[in-house]
A protein has these predicted regions:
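Beta/alpha (TIM)-barrel catalytic core signal, keyed to glycine-rich beta->alpha loops juxtaposed to Asp/Glu
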Residues: 1-117
Length: 117
């Protein structure tokens, strides 16, 4: 599937391609085949894919983090999670799941000030 997406990128049909390899090995394979970005799971309790942070940076690829807040089950403070997460320049986005607009607003307000700007 990734090869097909890369062909579409080469033809100018899409700007960038990426995937969630679900493992470090899957992420490495995607990077070696030319992925522009990876989606990884990363939070204080799930860090198996953390080695991909530097590998993505070294390959010029971006990172989208899923489950950054552990689906609401983490005990760490949200501001500290965001601070640690966005300390890595290759992490370009994070999926911040929520159950309500108020919860989303509170999550956004927990972002460190320098990230909000």
């Amino acid at each position: 599937a990734l090869r097909t997406l890369i062909k579409a990128r080469e033809q100018g049909l899409v700007h960038a391609v990426g995937l969630s390899g679900k493992t470090v090995e899957g992420g490495r394979l995607a990077l070696s085949q030319g992925a522009d970005c990876l989606m990884i799971t990363l939070n204080p309790e799930q860090s198996d894919e953390k080695p991909l942070i530097d590998e993505a940076k070294n390959n010029g690829a971006g990172l989208l983090v899923k489950k950054a807040l552990g689906s609401g089950h983490l005990t760490a403070s949200i501001p500290s999670i965001f601070k640690d997460l966005f300390a890595h320049p290759s992490i370009t986005s994070a999926i911040i799941g929520t159950i309500s607009p108020v919860h989303l607003r509170n999550n956004c307000l927990a972002l460190p000030t320098e990230i909000q700007q």
